[in-house]
């Protein structure tokens, strides 16, 4: 997904403030929830007849005490500038940008079936040793792998899946036949 300049400006501003008040993760969760609320009640939030203060109050009521003044101000700014259609993009981009700001690394792990907590911990420790950063693992299931995993991080791909090994063997056999 390509993120707009508008989204990145809002994300960078919220990250800067979040870092100062040590709430980067909290704001990420709030943005995710805001995105869910926005998508569910899009017609209400996009209605120009509804005043900004009413939209913000609705969000404050739905979030209860979990929302702080900084985040309320952020939401107000988004609605005042009529940028609410960017909320899903802002939420998605914030997630990835916050990983970088916190000096973590995104790790995509594709497996044939869901990994156990021990397997995830082993992958996490392996990645941490390789790049000396805390990994944030995103799991994806692809039954065509048969077994094993494909691990991607820092532009590297480690394929320890059965289908990957079978493909490698097939390439070697075909190269022998041609040679």
From Swiss-Prot:
Q: Provide the membrane topology annotation.
A: Peripheral membrane protein
Q: A Gene Ontology CC term for this entry?
A: plasma membrane
GO terms assigned for molecular function: proton-transporting ATP synthase activity, rotational mechanism
User: Coiled-coil annotation: which residues?
Assistant: none
Q: Where in the cell is it found?
A: Cell inner membrane
Keywords associated with the record:
ATP synthesis, Cell inner membrane, Cell membrane, CF(1), Hydrogen ion transport, Ion transport, Membrane, Transport
Top-level taxonomic group: Bacteria
Question: How does it associate, per the subunit comment?
Answer: F-type ATPases have 2 components, F(1) - the catalytic core - and F(0) - the membrane proton channel. F(1) has five subunits: alpha(3), beta(3), gamma(1), delta(1), epsilon(1). F(0) has three main subunits: a(1), b(2) and c(10-14). The alpha and beta chains form an alternating ring which encloses part of the gamma chain. F(1) is attached to F(0) by a central stalk formed by the gamma and epsilon chains, while a peripheral stalk is formed by the delta and b chains.
Job of this protein: F(1)F(0) ATP synthase produces ATP from ADP in the presence of a proton or sodium gradient. F-type ATPases consist of two structural domains, F(1) containing the extramembraneous catalytic core and F(0) containing the membrane proton channel, linked together by a central stalk and a peripheral stalk. During catalysis, ATP synthesis in the catalytic domain of F(1) is coupled via a rotary mechanism of the central stalk subunits to proton translocation.
State the similarity comment.
Belongs to the ATPase delta chain family.
Q: What's this protein's name? A: ATP synthase subunit delta
What does the record give as the organism's lineage? Bacteria, Thermotogati, Thermotogota, Thermotogae, Thermotogales
């Amino acid at each position: 997904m390509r993120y707009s300049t508008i989204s990145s400006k809002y994300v960078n501003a919220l990250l800067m403030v979040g870092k100062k008040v040590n709430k980067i993760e909290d704001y990420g969760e709030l943005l995710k929830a805001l995105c869910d609320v926005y998508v569910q009640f899009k017609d209400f939030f996009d209605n120009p007849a509804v005043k900004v203060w009413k939209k913000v109050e609705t969000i404050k009521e739905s979030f209860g005490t979990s929302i702080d003044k900084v985040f309320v101000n952020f939401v107000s700014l988004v609605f005042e500038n009529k940028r609410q259609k960017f909320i899903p993009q802002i939420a998605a981009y914030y997630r990835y940008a916050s990983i970088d700001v916190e000096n973590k690394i995104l790790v995509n792990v594709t497996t044939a079936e869901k990994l156990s907590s021990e397997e995830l911990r082993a992958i996490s420790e392996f990645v941490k040793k390789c790049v000396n950063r805390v990994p944030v693992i995103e799991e994806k299931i692809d039954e065509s792998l048969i077994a094993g995993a494909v691990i991607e991080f820092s532009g590297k791909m480690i394929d320890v899946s059965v289908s990957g090994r079978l493909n490698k063997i097939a390439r070697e056999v075909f190269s022998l036949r041609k040679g």
